[in-house]
Swiss-Prot record:
Main localization of the protein described in the UniProt heading: membrane
Free-text function comment from the UniProt entry: May help in the organization of the PsaE and PsaF subunits.
Protein name (database record): Photosystem I reaction center subunit IX
Membrane protein topology class: Single-pass membrane protein
InterPro entries: PSI_PsaJ, PSI_PsaJ_sf
Organism of provenance: Prochlorococcus marinus (strain MIT 9211)
GO BP: any one term: photosynthesis
Coiled coil ranges: none
Entry's localization field: Cellular thylakoid membrane
Lineage, highest ranks first: Bacteria, Bacillati, Cyanobacteriota, Cyanophyceae, Synechococcales
Top-level taxon of origin: Bacteria
Transmembrane parts of this sequence: 9-29
Pfam family, one: PSI_PsaJ
Keywords: Membrane, Photosynthesis, Photosystem I, Thylakoid, Transmembrane, Transmembrane helix
GO annotations of cellular component type: photosystem I; plasma membrane-derived thylakoid membrane
Amino acid sequence: MFKLFSTKWFRSAPVVATIWIVLTAGILVEWNRFVPDLLFHPGL
């Protein structure tokens, strides 16, 4: 399993970018689920 992380294709830019975007989207979704009013301010 750990040899997988040292392979060349896993460290390529599309794979790293996809993992980064998925993690960022997941963090935003979970943040908005627990604290729904901090991301969108309808009064502004």
